[in-house]
């Protein structure tokens, strides 16, 4: 159990880290201009039969929850889909036509000088165009005819208002995973939406933390040591921790929340995996937003190790040992040159 003074010191360090890593105005402006350039390049074209469309933003950028080198998540939506109708094209029913559309759009982005070496990931669950923007150096992902990410923005805004500690926690947890290569869904890591849901779910169910230091340490302990991936899944709306039930795993587990419920089927209607992370999408109840995070167990092991390292550091401080100027350095200390270089590059864009 850490003393109040050491947790207050950790709390202040978390505030300082967030103040440094949080988006600056010129960074947001450069990203705004990038969106406009892409919109100008694609918005004037008719990518779908007999229907125009538009570029929309989603994810960490419009929510203001991104790190300096974070990629941009965009979607090109037809007017029909945007106005409440069905998609003009669906990858599941017409993969060939969908892939052709993405390839044509990627060629357009390269032709006008925006995209550097764009490529299409056609076989993903959500097909995308990936490229690096020539001007900013930022990585960009563009999907087509999928508004699920856009619809989540209202949820982010609501959570930011209800749980003000979320902003600081997101920055910390993202940085912890970025430094260990566990923050990208396409490599099996935890995506931004999953990270946010983990944090919000913890805040909703845990005892109210005294400060950010207490909250962060509790988060690391809960997901690193107490949360059983094989037995539990997370429901965001309404908030609950549910038991996974499958033919392989009869559940008798009870821990952490008085609102622990039991489910007889998985989020997507299929048998629950007893090795993966399951988080029910608050805006699409049959969608497991962490379904692609096959390395979730590695991420949770990182949380466990970070908790132990941080707890040892705090204990050493309490005992009067010299730990240096930073507590957080033991888990997120490192080379931040990539952030400095990216910020310098964006600051020079007129």
Predicted features and spans:
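Pol beta-like nucleotidyltransferase catalytic core
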Residues: 6-15, 201-350
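Residues that form ligand- and interface-recognition hot spots within folded domains
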Residues: 42, 57-62, 66, 76-80, ...
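Conserved catalytic core of two-metal-ion nucleotidyltransferases
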Residues: 94-148
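Eukaryotic short linear interaction motifs
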Residues: 63-66, 74-75, 82-86, 127-128, ...
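Eukaryotic intrinsically disordered and solvent-exposed regulatory patches
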Residues: 58-63, 113-117, 125-128, 181-187
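Surface-exposed beta-strand-to-loop junctions
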Residues: 8-22, 74-87, 110, 144-154, ...
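Basic, alpha-helical interaction scaffolds
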Residues: 153-192
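N-terminal regions immediately upstream of nucleotidyltransferase
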Residues: 1-69, 81-100, 120
């Amino acid at each position: 159990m850490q003393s109040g003074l050491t947790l207050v010191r950790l709390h202040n360090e978390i505030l300082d880290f967030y103040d440094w890593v949080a988006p600056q105005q010129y960074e947001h402006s450069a990203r705004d201009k990038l969106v406009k350039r892409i919109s100008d390049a694609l918005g004037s074209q008719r990518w779908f039969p007999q229907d125009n469309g538009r570029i929309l933003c989603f994810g960490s950028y419009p929510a203001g929850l991104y790190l300096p080198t974070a990629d941009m998540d965009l979607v090109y939506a037809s007017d029909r889909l945007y106005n409440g109708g069905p998609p003009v094209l669906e990858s599941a029913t017409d993969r060939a036509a969908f892939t052709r559309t993405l390839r044509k759009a990627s060629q357009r982005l390269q032709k006008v000088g925006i995209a550097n070496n764009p490529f299409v990931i056609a076989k993903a669950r959500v097909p995308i165009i990936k490229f690096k923007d020539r001007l900013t150096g930022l990585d960009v992902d563009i999907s087509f005819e999928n508004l699920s990410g856009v619809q989540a923005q209202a949820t982010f805004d609501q959570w930011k208002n209800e749980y003000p500690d979320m902003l600081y926690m997101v920055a910390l947890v993202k940085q912890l995973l970025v430094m260990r290569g566990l923050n990208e869904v396409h490599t099996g890591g935890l995506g931004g939406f999953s990270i946010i849901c983990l944090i919000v779910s913890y805040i909703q169910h845990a005892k109210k933390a005294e400060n950010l230091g207490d909250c962060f340490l509790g988060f690391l302990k809960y997901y690193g040591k107490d949360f059983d991936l094989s037995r539990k899944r997370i429901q965001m709306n309404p908030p609950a921790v549910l038991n996974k039930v499958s033919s392989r795993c009869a559940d008798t587990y009870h821990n952490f929340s008085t609102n622990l419920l039991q489910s007889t089927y998985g989020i997507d209607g299929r048998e629950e995996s007893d090795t993966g992370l399951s988080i029910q999408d608050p805006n699409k109840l049959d969608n497991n937003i962490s379904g692609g995070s096959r390395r979730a167990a590695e991420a949770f092991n990182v949380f466990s190790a970070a908790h132990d390292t941080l707890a040892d550091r705090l204990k050493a401080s309490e005992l009067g040992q010299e730990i240096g100027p930073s507590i957080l350095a033991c888990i997120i200390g490192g080379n931040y040159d990539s952030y400095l270089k990216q910020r310098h590059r964006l600051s020079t864009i007129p």
